[in-house]
Amino acid sequence: MGRRAKMVEKVKTLMETHDQIRNMGICAHIDHGKTTLSDNLLAGAGMISKELAGDQLALDFDEEEAARGITIYAANVSMVHEYGGKEYLINLIDTPGHVDFGGDVTRAMRAIDGAVVVCCAVEGVMPQTETVLRQALKEKVKPVLFINKVDRLINELKLTPEELQGRFMKIIAEVNKLIEKMAPEEFKTEWLCDVANGKVAFGSAYNNWAISVPYMQRSGISFKDIIDYCEQEKQGELADKAPLHEVVLDMSIKHLPNPLQAQKYRIPNIWKGDAESAIGKSMVECNPNGPLAGVVTKIIVDKHAGAISACRLFSGRIKQGDDLYLVGSKQKARAQQVSIFMGAERVQVPSISAGNICALTGLREATAGETVCSPSEILEPGFESLSHTSEPVITVAIEAKNTKDLPKLIEILRQIAREDNTVRVEINEETGEHLISGMGELHIEVITNTKIGRDGGIEVDVGEPIVVYRETIMGTSPEIEGKSPNKHNKLYMIAEPMEESVYAAYVEGKLHDEDYKKKTTADGEARLVEAGLEKDQAKKVMSIYNGNMIVNMTRGIVQLDEARELIIEGFKEGVRNGPLAAEKVQGVKIKLMDATFHEDAIHRGPAQIIPAVRFGVRDAVSQAKPVLLEPMQSVYINTPQDYMGDGMKEINNRRGQILDMEQEGDMSIIKSSVPVAEMFGFAGAIRGATQGRCLWSVEFSGFEKVPGELQPKIVKQIRDRKGLKSE
């Protein structure tokens, strides 16, 4: 039996031993060393256990993988590591750190139970560190900390052992402050990163060494020894004495939970069904013999196998050929192949049980976040939808250069939308152009150049990037009458701003449209009251859509129940295009005050009720002091003090606002807020202004009101672009 086959057998055995499984991710700010760490953990584990292969074979195996150009970035890898005389199966997910790819991070968090948060020793805690930590804690994923690039503190900043420890303590304190602020109540203390018990490791992923306090006590290596090894350029020797993979994986096995432990508290957080039902209990217990329940966390497109769904199973088992049911798309599917991820390849296995991460082919209609179950035992409701910390803020129009490529382009766009639910794809009915909305310039570039151009082989014309605006209201409208085209049905409504706390709860993913579709559920009502809506109104919410809500304040109107679905559809159509520039409306509450309907049902059908509500909503919004909102980004610049003035000038020239400034040694950290519309070309400009000496990053920070003096000009530009008549 070859070493690969032995490894697969080892993984198959461990998959059934839940307390010896760790589903973990690596996440960090961009360029803090995630992928280097992932690659070296993989190399260190030899992708096979040491006792099976010996060092020589492990190296051969790794070189063979390297020759294939393996990069496990944003991919899933199963590997085996020995700790305390036992072997453990580690399912590792590496996540991207660039702000434009935050969606990948969110999806990965649903699959894992623990995360190694990587933080650069030189830069410290950065915006994306906070973002990925927030996403992890929201999904009840337990963190441990790896402080990377320690060699740079020694060789570049020449820190003494005392200064080194001081820098570590500062980073740990900042991370713990974030954990205390954002962790679930029951874990605020338990999940803090404690150096003494080994929840923190320090090292250099690039030079393949790491250390933790328990490892220092065991091995006798001190901070002074580490400085000596680095200064004398003997990091190779240090890597032999304190191998990166051993220290980081030991820490992960000791401190991160197995699926049996994690699912007890994670399932109630991501599934809102009946905890006492058979499937509810089975998921909490991670029962491999219970009803099937899993969630698709990523769609990977393979030229030969087609769409591959990476799936985390919480209950039951999937075998090749099993019939499956996709709850979100309400479709049946068949598991054509069931595999595990082994580096860049997939290895077929007969079945996968609860607590594991697997690769499934055959789920053609699946999207990231889809709930998978058995057609004979449908999981209702499905898992909570994945909520992202950012949303698409830039749109481009694309057209195939060659019209014969159009069907292929449509298929690729459908595939991209399934793979990445932070991308919006729409067709402009008037021009026939495809509109793609993404998280930023880089996100759009990757879609158009890489996914459509390189992978799809289609040449496209890409339009100028357009910023996505929103509309909202600042006042309350008078009572407005919405009249049906036949004049026999009248609905009376008021538009007013939604309570800020309720809108914030919606943005944070605490309110879901599903809870209000047929009739407000008790859970839905409780969430609204908790968010700050009056109890009397919470019972009467008819729909929540795109951050807007409609509340039925009428009494005793018999036909209203029959017309409910039509009223909701009219409301949705009414808030899709605001009165100023036909941009989406957000933060608006429509109160339905009264209604009169024709007694004959034939005269109150969809063609009558939907337009009546749509026109009423639009009219009410237009009379409630509508304003335009623009997307904002937090911009962080880390620059030598000599260039601080240039950095600030660059922000001020872009309608930016300086929020805070800090000095750290000879570096200045500028924290600011800048409109997305002013950020085009920022990368080149800031590099030029600071002669390439600065580090910078951005993060979506929500929508803000456009300054009053600029609103007419921007509204006119949008209306002209859309071919709408001037106001």
From Swiss-Prot:
Keywords: Cytoplasm, Elongation factor, GTP-binding, Nucleotide-binding, Protein biosynthesis
Domain tr-type G: start-end pairs: 19-260
Locations listed in the record: Cytoplasm
Gene: fusA
Stated name of the protein: Elongation factor 2
Cystine pairings recorded for this chain: none
Purpose: Catalyzes the GTP-dependent ribosomal translocation step during translation elongation. During this step, the ribosome changes from the pre-translocational (PRE) to the post-translocational (POST) state as the newly formed A-site-bound peptidyl-tRNA and P-site-bound deacylated tRNA move to the P and E sites, respectively. Catalyzes the coordinated movement of the two tRNA molecules, the mRNA and conformational changes in the ribosome.
Family: Belongs to the TRAFAC class translation factor GTPase superfamily. Classic translation factor GTPase family. EF-G/EF-2 subfamily.
Database matches in HAMAP family: EF_G_EF_2_A (MF_00054_A)
Residues annotated as binding GTP: 28-35, 94-98, 148-151
PROSITE patterns referenced in this protein's UniProt entry, alphabetically: G_TR_1, G_TR_2
Domain of life: Archaea
One GO cellular component term: ribonucleoprotein complex
UniProt modified residues of type Diphthamide: H603
A GO molecular-function annotation: translation elongation factor activity
